[in-house]
Amino acid sequence: EERETIENGSNVASKSGFTGILLNSNTKPVADNQTDISFIKLKSKNSICNIYPLGALTISSKSVEMAELFDMKNSGAVGFYDYKKPILNSNLLKTSLLYSQSFDSVVMSFPMDQSIAKKGIINEGMISVSYGVKGIPNFSEEIQINRDLHILEYTGGKLHIPTISTKKSLDLIKKAKSKGLNVS
């Protein structure tokens, strides 16, 4: 198996018709500081397609302590996301949304309440039952989105929810947008 690099990732993206791609923060090491983002920007300077790095929202993507958001933004990060990991601490999301407004940046939040999802791997339903795999109840996603939108309504800022899988989740986001919240 070949290790993906910035160069070959850029080449594949370009051949697939993309002119720019987001680079998630789940690199090795996790891109959670100014040096990591500067390195990514330097290595991608001559790439065929534009690379837009995301910085980790928290140190080592552990959802404990906020990373150096302002410094990463100044080094070229376009947003902040602990790749496929929910923000467990509501106050951390609140603080991140408040702080990121001062430098016009976006916070991304993975929509899953882990205490409900546990070790599920697909949405709970007929397919999970027929394959005999642990399902994730829909409300695991919807509870997290609802919490995040309430916090966004309180703080303002920009919130991106990178994946949704239920109609109710979509309806929650539509309702928030109709209230003027900056959510995508």
Predicted features by range, described:
Residues Q34-L54, L98-M112:
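Alpha-helix-loop-beta-strand connector modules within alpha/beta enzyme cores
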Residues S16, C49, S75:
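Structured loop/turn residues at beta-strand edges in well-structured enzyme cores
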Residues E1-E4, S25, C49-E65, K84, ...:
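Active-site mouth loops of central-metabolism enzymes
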Residues E1-K45:
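Metal-associated gating/positioning segment near the N- to mid-region
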Residues G20-N24, L54, M108-P111, I161:
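Short beta-strand segments at enzyme active-site cores
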Residues M66-S184:
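Histidine/acidic residue-rich metal-binding segments in metalloenzymes
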Residues K28-D32, S60-S61, K85-L88, S165:
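Glycine-/small-residue-rich active-site loops that bind phosphorylated ligands and cofactors
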Residues T5, D32-D36, V64-E65, L92-L93, ...:
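Residues at alpha-helix caps and immediate loop-helix transition turns in enzyme cores, especially N-
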